[in-house]
From Swiss-Prot:
The keyword Transcription regulation does not apply. Pfam families: FAD_binding_4 (PF01565), MurB_C (PF02873). This is UDP-N-acetylenolpyruvoylglucosamine reductase. The gene is murB. InterPro entries: FAD-bd_PCMH, FAD-bd_PCMH-like_sf, FAD-bd_PCMH_sub1, FAD-bd_PCMH_sub2, MurB, MurB_C, MurB_C_sf, Oxid_FAD_bind_N.
Length: 349
């Protein structure tokens, strides 16, 4: 365990905004987590578990303790049909996917290059190119912050949805994910429905082929957060009614959409791009010129710049299409999680 007093959070969030915290503690084990949550010194302080900070925007000084998750380790067991991989929650997700591909554990390759750590994956139910975590997740192990006991949820108990899970609702602020177990079928079935992957639909395609192709696609479309500060997709793809979709198609016949149970899922990046916002900039914050769904820190952005830009994008899309975008990125103001409308009101009133 390592304790840092009133230090900058810049190295610990992929937006690279220069906010700070009262206290930063690095937790290297489950016992460290138990010690932190049971220590009377921290009882009245807000405590935020943080993995890679790849889906987080600190909007001002964090009044409390930021606990860096540095729980590492991997183990593999198997049945006749599946590999079961138990992954500690601090493991880097992109490195994990590459390790799986290199070691013959197929079925995870579509989730290549998604920034973050393994413990964050079930919170958001991360997904890309036709695959979601829920499709390969066997169970999630977590530390109950009330009892300080380790508990486990089966896949069905995690209540996975589109960028949703029980960890964002019923168990929010009540647990820390300590490990996940993945179930990967030994009989690999590639997921190639996504357009650019269609040229891999032949009998000779391997998991490495799919992994390499997805890395190529993502490298072209998405900026590397190690080079350009960003949190990946800033907004969720909205779901609208069939009637709303048909009405929009009269004006925008090329509007891309996908059938879902609730109606039509619309590509948020297309909405932003079609609104002419690619490259739009507010001080150091900018809509990425290649992928409109990504907001970037060009090097000098403050959290306020990013909030102003996000609010402008949200309002522009609402005015143009009558669609309200919901952000994927989680915002923290005064040590508490908040939302874009609240944060904008806080900054401008």
């Amino acid at each position: 365990m390592q304790i840092l007093l009133n230090k900058t959070l810049k190295p610990y969030n992929s937006f690279s905004v220069n906010e700070s915290a009262d206290l930063i503690i690095q937790a290297d084990s489950i016992q460290d987590l138990i010690d932190i949550w049971s220590d009377k010194k921290y009882t009245d302080m807000t405590k935020l578990p943080l993995g890679r900070g790849s889906n987080t925007l600190f909007c001002n000084h964090f009044n409390g303790v930021v606990v860096l998750n540095r729980l590492f380790g991997k183990s593999v067991t198997e049945t006749d049909t599946d590999y079961l991989l138990k992954i500690s929650s601090g493991e880097d997700w992109p490195a994990l996917v590459e390790w799986c591909v290199d070691n013959g554990f197929a079925g995870i390759e579509n989730l290549a290059m998604i920034p973050g750590c393994a413990g964050s994956a079930p919170i958001q139910n991360i997904g890309a190119y036709g695959l979601e975590l829920k499709d390969i997740c066997e169970s999630v192990e977590y530390l109950d912050l009330e009892t300080l006991q380790i508990k486990t949820l089966k896949n069905s108990e995690c209540l996975f949805g589109y960028r949703e899970s029980i960890f964002k609702h019923e168990l929010k602020d009540r647990c820390i994910i300590t490990a996940i177990t993945l179930r990967l079928n030994k009989q690999w079935q590639p997921v190639l429905a996504y357009g650019p992957l269609s040229d891999l639909r032949n009998s000779k395609t391997t998991p490495k082929n799919v992994f390499d192709k997805i890395c190529e696609i993502r490298s072209k479309k998405l900026p590397d957060p190690n080079v350009i500060g960003n949190a990946g997709s800033f907004f969720k793809n909205p779901v609208i009614s069939e009637e709303h979709y048909l009405a929009l198609c009269e004006t925008y016949p090329n509007l891309p959409a996908y059938d879902v149970t609730e109606g039509k899922k619309i590509a948020a990046g297309w909405l932003i791009d079609n609104a002419g916002l690619k490259g739009f900039k507010i001080n150091g914050a900018q809509v990425h010129q290649e992928q409109a769904l990504v907001l970037i820190n060009t090097g000098t952005a403050t959290s306020e710049d990013i909030l102003e830009l996000a609010n402008h994008v949200k309002n522009s899309v609402l005015d143009m299409y009558d669609i309200e975008l919901e952000h994927e990125v989680r915002f923290y103001l005064n040590g508490e999680e908040s939302f874009l409308s609240e944060l904008f009101d806080e900054r401008t009133h």
